[in-house]
């Protein structure tokens, strides 16, 4: 056999590739990892942020401290306990008092960022500045943000995570009224000016389609509004007023205009210069119910237009997707020319909360006499496909199917449709209800959650490496178990187990240990300079 002679440099490079593995740009991801590699932070781009997420009402508690006023969730869960599993956020998991301890839990995980939300009524107890400002409430978030930064953890702040001031709900119906736009801008502008010098990553609204649909179309979350024919089958008790097929669109319209006004205020804020702002969207992925059915395949784009394009198209392009205009018609409010101009390009990044996927089937015969949001998309959400197969896997304790392929597909979809924007994964996590088996021992042995995180981190890495998606950060939902809205405390998402029977003691779970070890390899971003502390 005759061997072709190679230059010494080529031979050296060949041996380097054999010994070291794939070459990588110093700032880029390792693409692909060696087959023997255990995925870790080291395989992601330099400066990629990893963190955990929470929300004020779900973790803070201390509802009577700092002169905090009531939110819709305070009143909803106390007045209708059956709609919140008999639980409420009065104490939640005591984060208000234990945040310093909990920040040490974040450090233990090797995370470098933390997503929190500000309670509107801890700043303005009755919704507006003219009704009073809680100085101690304002100081609480200063103290929290300062403590995070002292510990090298970058704060990401959500301005609104579903806790509308009850005063504004009573006065004009909250987000059902256009009055909310002015009041939200005032509140957002206040927190930007107060914290904008310390916080450079902002989210105006969390999961707007869920907020509108669950709260105003199927009655599943506060304020529990729906038409009786549209009420979600899991909801206990009656709809608390409402008009399905109409109110969700009105609420979202006001929310989007409030977002645009808040972004304008943010971009005019001197302290906020160099910061970024966006929305945390919450898409599922859809696979065709029947791959042989052309109509079934066409449902995917339509479903995504309704649950993501509804708010993402609008903040990118200035208006609703054409599919929504065509189908919803007069029930979909119209933007003015001025509103369109403010909405267009009103996000610096795309926040994505991803949990699960489902099958989509074309809805042949919608009932026009009983309009409702999901029906409007002409899509049926199906748990199993035409062959009676569940999407992904469905662990016994998990209420949602696990399908990490859907995560990657969502990311590629956003890249392709919206010209490769910066994407930050604001939430990704696994919930489980242990029921009668709930204990510290069983709750911390969360191997299903560990598996979920492994699969989704791999899918995200493939999206970055192979699909060239511009993902820059990832937050696990959640740091610890917390109050999960209509599920109360029964649905656990945390990397730390909260012992509700024993002084809310925190216990690291198997998934927490996995995330800690995943983040222990590679360099943490040094994004906080000493002069910023």
UniProtKB/Swiss-Prot annotation:
KW Transmembrane (keyword) present: no
Gene Ontology molecular function: beta-glucosidase activity
Enzyme Commission designation: 3.2.1.21
Keyword Signal in annotation: yes
GO CC field: endoplasmic reticulum lumen; plastid
UniProt cross-references to SUPFAM superfamilies, sorted A to Z: (Trans)glycosidases
Name the UniProt record assigns to this protein: Beta-glucosidase 24
Disulfide bonding pattern of the chain: 226-239
Signal peptide: 1-26
